[in-house]
Amino acid sequence: MASRKEALARRANRVRRHLKSVANGRPRLSVHRSSKNIYAQVIDDVAGKTLAAASTLDKDLRGSLKTGADTAAAALVGKLVAERASKAGVTDVVFDRGAFIYHGRIKALADAAREGGLTF
């Protein structure tokens, strides 16, 4: 039986394999959630470059947050990454949730990124 870490890695690889088939050259909005923070970055896989990034550890957000581990913090990160992506000229992305289910903080970040101007 696979360990929890192996199962998460397998699920993340399955999601990314599907994304590559539907991406059509679009950059991906990759999300990582830890117990204390949330991170998001827009990655151009063709060029191998990060186009925009934001997290609850950014100086812009750190002072205004009570904690980096709630849906309000995730929504602020989503709005910030959408703003930075639009400055980089990116509006259309594919959403890479990794091994995380689309619920709670991940959903809050995605909804805020959509409101900020990203389409996926």
Swiss-Prot record:
Q: Name one GO biological process term.
A: translation
A GO cellular component term found in this entry reads: cytosolic large ribosomal subunit
List the InterPro entries: Ribosomal_uL18_bac-type, Ribosomal_uL18_bac/euk
Per UniProt, what is one GO molecular function of this protein?
A: 5S rRNA binding
Question: Which keywords, in A-to-Z order, does the entry hold?
Answer: Ribonucleoprotein, Ribosomal protein, RNA-binding, rRNA-binding
Domain of life from the UniProt record:
Bacteria
Under the heading CDD domains, the entry gives:
Ribosomal_L18_L5e (cd00432)
What is the protein's quaternary organization?
A: Part of the 50S ribosomal subunit; part of the 5S rRNA/L5/L18/L25 subcomplex. Contacts the 5S and 23S rRNAs.
Query: HAMAP family in the record, alphabetically?
Result: Ribosomal_uL18_B
Functional description taken from the UniProt entry? This is one of the proteins that bind and probably mediate the attachment of the 5S RNA into the large ribosomal subunit, where it forms part of the central protuberance.
Report the family membership: Belongs to the universal ribosomal protein uL18 family.
Q: What is this protein called?
A: Large ribosomal subunit protein uL18
What organism is this sequence from?
Rhizobium leguminosarum bv. trifolii (strain WSM2304)
